[in-house]
Amino acid sequence: MGSFGLRENEIMTVDLHTMNVSEAKAWLKGKVDRAPREIREIEVIHGYHGGTALKNMVLRSFHHPRVRQKIMGLNPGSTILILK
């Protein structure tokens, strides 16, 4: 079982390390656009040691029709996107 009681095939992880904010936003949008319907959750690894720009983008300015909710991860370097 994955987080929130989901099976492994319902969770996807994306890593934004090494990207700037505009690259990361476009790349994340593409990942959510192409995520199969069975994917219910995306763990976004944005890091936190290098600053909060990516984290702030994910939490505040990233919007997508498929994203129902954003939850801060247990690790301060990640955010969970709950999909519709």
Residue ranges and their predicted role:
Residues 1-84:
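Long, charged, low-complexity intrinsically disordered regions
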